[in-house]
Amino acid sequence: MSLLCVRVKRAKFQGSPDKFNTYVTLKVQNVKSTTVAVRGDQPSWEQDFMFEISRLDLGLSVEVWNKGLIWDTMVGTVWIALKTIRQSDEEGPGEWSTLEAETLMKNDEICGTKNPTPHKILLGTRFELPFDIPEEEARYWTYKLEQINALADDNEYSSQEESQRKLLPTAAAQCRHWTYLGWGEHQTFEDPDSAVDDRDSDYRSETSNSAPPPYHTTTQPNASAHQFPMPVPLPQQLFLQGSSRDSCNDSMQSYDLDYPERRALSPTSSSRYGSSCNVSRGSSLLSELDQYHEQDDDGRERDSIHSSHSYGSLSRDGQAGLGEQEKALEVACESQKEKTGESKERDDATVCPPSDLMLHKDLTLGPQESFPEEKASSPFTQARAHWFRAVTKVRLQLQEISDDGDPSLPQWLPEGPAGGLYGIDSMPDLRRKKPLPLVSDLAMSLVQSRKAGITSAMATRTSLKDEDLKSHVYKKTLQALIYPISCTTPHNFEVWSATTPTYCYECEGLLWGLARQGMRCSECGVKCHEKCQDLLNADCLQRAAEKSSKHGAEDRTQNIIMAMKDRMKIRERNKPEIFEVIRDVFTVSKVAHVQQMKTVKQSVLDGTSKWSAKITITVVCAQGLQAKDKTGSSDPYVTVQVGKTKKRTKTIFGNLNPVWEEKFHFECHNSSDRIKVRVWDEDDDIKSRVKQRLKRESDDFLGQTIIEVRTLSGEMDVWYNLEKRTDKSAVSGAIRLQINVEIKGEEKVAPYHVQYTCLHENLFHYLTDIQGSGGVWIPDARGDDAWKVYFDETAQEIVDEFAMRYGIESIYQAMTHFACLSSKYMCPGVPAVMSTLLANINAYYAHTTASTNVSASDRFAASNFGKERFVKLLDQLHNSLRIDLSTYRNNFPAGSPERLQDLKSTVDLLTSITFFRMKVQELQSPPRASQVVKDCVKACLNSTYEYIFNNCHDLYSHQYQLQEQPLEEPGPSIRNLDFWPKLITLIVSIIEEDKNSYTPVLNQFPQELNVGKVSAEVMWHLFAQDMKYALEEHEKDRLCKSADYMNLHFKVKWLHNEYVRELPALQGQVPEYPAWFEQFVLQWLDENEDVSLEFLRGGLERDKRDGFQQTSEHALFSCSVVDVFTQLNQSFEIIRKLECPDPSILAHYMRRFAKTIGKVLIQYADILSKNFPAYCTKERLPCILMNNMQQLRVQLEKMFEAMGGKELDSEAADSLKELQVKLNTVLDELSMVFGNSFQVRIDECVRQMADILGQVRGTGNASPNARASVAQDADSVLRPLMDFLDGNLTLFATVCEKTVLKRVLKELWRVVMNTMERVIVLPPLIDQTGTQLILTAAKELSQLSKLKDHMVREETRNLTPKQCAVLDLALDTVKQYFHAGGNGLKKTFLEKSPDLQSLRYALSLYTQTTDTLIKTFVRSQTAQVHDGKGIRFTANEDIRPEKGAGVDDPVGEVSIQVDLFTHPGTGEHKVTVKVVAANDLKWQTAGMFRPFVEVTMVGPHQSDKKRKFTTKSKSNSWTPKYNETFHFLLGNEEGPEAYELQICVKDYCFAREDRVIGLAVMPLRDVAAKGSCACWCPLGRKIHMDETGMTILRILSQRSNDEVAREFVKLKSESRSIEEGS
């Protein structure tokens, strides 16, 4: 067998880091192990695995897998031949291997790989060397194995030996095989990691990702799904027949608290082969066997036994050698039994290892096992039969020994499932249905570990098995209890006067005074100071007997002895239960017990008369002494006095922590004597010399300790606290003494502290495991010393009397009981007792007094219990507590108040351990108890979550479903979402349990730990990871309905809001869960949009069938509006109830929903707009439809406010605002269509008004009669219009909503005003011919003549002043009518209405002269050509400017020089215009092109002046030069700003009208400031004007008799003619 160590380090993958979540599987020899899964393209595992290899011709297969939601995919594989792996005891840097895609197979076994991939993995592989084997021993075994291999020349086994050499490459490896196969179980006692440490490594790997210690087997927590056991092959089972994994090691598995290097078997190393086995122990035992045989003269026998140590190799002489071998085995077993000196009754199992070794040798490397190619031959050759016979013989011997011994020892059991061999890192396949109830299986392995860990410390403790020690302690206990110190006769002190100088027996001070100096016992005669009488505790009777015996007073002695006898008889009669308990505890037969009682009584009666001892005292050192010198130091020395013999050490100068290391020998013949050890400060000054003359003690006293000789036994290394002699003493510190006592008859016994430990442990074992069936008795004591009560009254008296008799400190008792309880710390009530015990132990060491300056750490180091021993015990306990707290839900069920109380006490105990480490051990920063508990709680929650995740369906159906449900997939699925609501339900039950049951219990750290909140935080964190990953997978396929995702979203939201939102750790953070569902919510919104549109169409269809009926008597709109917004509101309510806490995601939802609203309402509006004209002929229906549109706007505003109003996302808000504007526009358009539908009837009414108005005659004077006449005429004129309006507006006021009514009134007002302007004020425009001619500006020149003819034919229809006054009054009446006393349109709107303004302006223009109108036109029309842009000015005509800006498509350009001169006297203006040239004329013509320029002055007061000049024409020139000058004279009535020059370029045509090429207008106001300038005017196609200009043009067009007016209209109506080629 070889041990293969593999470390999976890290890997490098090609690709996106997001797509990798990988783990590694290792396969070798049918054993498979798996790492944890790690995300990223450069994962780091750093996990160790160990395998036992029996065939080096195989290989290690390494596969890298990528985790998926449903199935995993392989990234690549590597195959490593085992023969190529190096041997080393140190881990190397590892080697990079390229992953390949396929494996090569040969004979159904992998033999290589092919098809490299771009991925790589770093692996460290090696074969382990024997652990910690000394070099000398390695050389010895190398030599031995070479000898054995040299003997293997037998022909029968030559081929097998050759193969064996291949399998055992080095001697070191062979030695390693011996270690693992022969002594694997026993070596675990020297394992560098204890059982609890082993389990803690598991715990660490789960919680802190720390790597397990080297040479250690740790179960991979995440590998269970890929691991499986391999059964033992049949031939191996044959040789395992009758064997057991636990055989032959019960007595070896001892755990003595005095020897902490011994450890119990590691519980996690459940494999037969422990992980950190030390070879040297097994090797030394083998060496002893060799030494035994080397003393034998027979060389063949020695060779034979050496051969038996090999792996199945035989001696040269075949059968004879085999017989020698059998004999050697028997001799070896006998010699081993003799060496240990144990009787057959004790049945020490150390006889077993050699036979066990033989079994395993044959099992592992027998010929049939190691060489499969030999299997074709007979399985039982002659040599193999000899082997089998030898093994069977040894097994039968062991069977007999076992039958004669303790029946509790395990027998050789037949093989079964437990007999299989497992890989070190393998585990059973756990992919099965977990049992119920909740989390019951979660930490079962850890529970078993605990039972096998610290608990085994009690079950296999040395004191329970060491019969010699138990026998001695049994006697000593009887001795202490038959005549206990607590029941001894007290001294009978009387005041006594000394006649000679007498010294106190206690303090050895002089009894000062003339009389009545002290006290004297009348019985035993001891004398002392009055203050010292309480310090004497020796039994007066016994002391008197001893004294009488020494002085020969036989009669008195006999009386005292009889008194003591009587007392012991009374004691035995009154307290028989005490001695019965002692007998039961030590399992002594009644006969032996009676005999032993007699012996003990006699030893008490003998007292010290027959007692003697040799005492060796080594004064080692002291710590923390008082400083007595002025220098702040002392010069200490020690005096030791036994009886009357006194000795002293040398002086150590200037040291408060002196080291003496001086040894003194004493003989003592009185067991009641005391050893007085006193520490002094040596003074050598004058004062001390004077004191030396006067006093016995001239030096300063530093402290003392008084030791009862009867409390000593064996070898002791003890720290004693220095104590005061009087109240005035200033004492501190402790002294270390090594005391060796050889009591006559008890030369080889353990110290009393060890004996007390034996008594306490055996008593605890008896009361707990035997009498209490595993339960621990909890004392019900009260008071300050209640913590010192460990057992019931009888057992407590036993330990107290023993401690009192033999000087066992109470703190040692407490620590011993604490150690015992640590093996039962999970029993009900025990944690509370342990917590109290440890708190008092802490108080003892940590709470220093004013009289001592020794630190707590030093005081603890001086503990007789052993510092390392107690610290190791606490470390083990601390680890076990962490593991149990990491499964608190299983170990401390919420339904058990008693266990919850134990949980609280367990945390208190953990806190006490932390206090101990901080205050007693004085560690700098021990782990805080609160943090440890918090980590444990998190670890438990992690495990709990994993459990409920893996068993979700089973747990849910068990707890929440009464009826049987069909089988479902065990985990999450992409086909449905059923798994997640169930998981949420289970998570809530866990959090509620933690909040309600565990939080009130684990309340020791209110500021740092709240279990309910931690539970919610951990559960949410783990749930969030899985939920996010699952939804990412769902997003790819989306196999579920969007409604299902929305329902799950609501459940997740509820979970977060209910339990997570208020957690301190998550305060101020935006939750992540809305992001997981964002795409699904948007999908739902997309689908919801289609649903809303369907609702819209359906609602409109129903509305249409019903004739758009009002929804109610008071509602003015129809049902379709209600239908549309019912659906939209329901949809928004769902979005609102999501309560999305992420503003950005909520903004996405709002934007998307705003689009839905917009799409639905716009489609509604489009449908109404499309069908609206068809309904305008009906009276009420158009009003209801407009009401519907208005109601859409009202509901949209409400929805806008519901969606957040001003707080709404800006993009969504802008979208809704834009929608509101669109709806408003639609309503305006509907109102306009509705208003225009009345155009024909209003035209008819207005024509009737015009006819009536045309009949009005008279002047417009201001007399009262005239005013009355005007009012009467106005009423007559309005009557046709008012009759029409009365009927309709009354209906509108009833049917329309107020907003709609105002819009309808506005449209009617517009139509009435425009019609009155068009029909009455500007009647020629009614003629479409005239209108067309004016508006199109006579595109053809021929049409100009038609316009003239038309204007001539049209009769003049100028309104008279009276008619204007009537019409103006009629307008006021109409205005009042539309205002309707405040119920209609506002007066402000009516007054500022552009339609009324236009009408009134037209009326006002009617009364103005032609000059005034022309002046108004020039001043108001500033953008007639090219929007008034493009004219450039230069200083003179020779400087041509850049092209004008803002001019699109000019048809040419004219250059003119303008000079403006104003006469200083008359104020008249003279304008000189020089037409320089025309440039870039754009004109196409087939014939002659003769352009010329026409310049016209436009303005008032020009009727008597020349207004127009024309240049000569230039033939066929598109850039003609003219250089012609013209002069215009202007009056002084107006300034230059009332005039403008209009330049028109025309093509001269003979016999027909000239054609216009382009026009330009230059206002003189631009020249006025300059006076003189060169102008460059771009030519436009026609004159543009606004409404004012058009109105003036219309009015002037009616003045056909006014030449200036006609010329002006013609001038402004001209436009570019159609080109011949276009």
From Swiss-Prot:
Tissue specificity note: Isoform 1 is ubiquitously expressed. Isoform 2 is expressed in brain, predominantly in cerebral cortex, hippocampus and striatum.
Reported cofactor(s): Ca(2+)
Binding site for Ca(2+) 1: D629, D635, D681, D683
Membrane topology: Peripheral membrane protein
Compositionally biased tracts (Polar residues): 206-225, 238-254, 266-280
Coiled-coil intervals: 1210-1231
Entry-linked SMART domains: C1 (SM00109), C2 (SM00239), DUF1041 (SM01145)
Biased composition (Basic and acidic residues): 196-205, 292-306, 324-349
Low complexity bias (residue ranges): 307-318
Residue sites binding Ca(2+) 2 per the record: D629, D681, D683, D700
Gene3D superfamilies (UniProt xref): 1.10.357.50, 1.20.58.1100, 3.30.60.20, C2 domain (2.60.40.150)
Keywords: Calcium, Cell membrane, Coiled coil, Cytoplasm, Exocytosis, Membrane, Metal-binding, Phosphoprotein, Repeat, Synapse, Zinc, Zinc-finger
Family recorded in the similarity comment: Belongs to the unc-13 family.
Name the record gives this protein: Protein unc-13 homolog B
UniProt organism field: Rattus norvegicus (Rat)
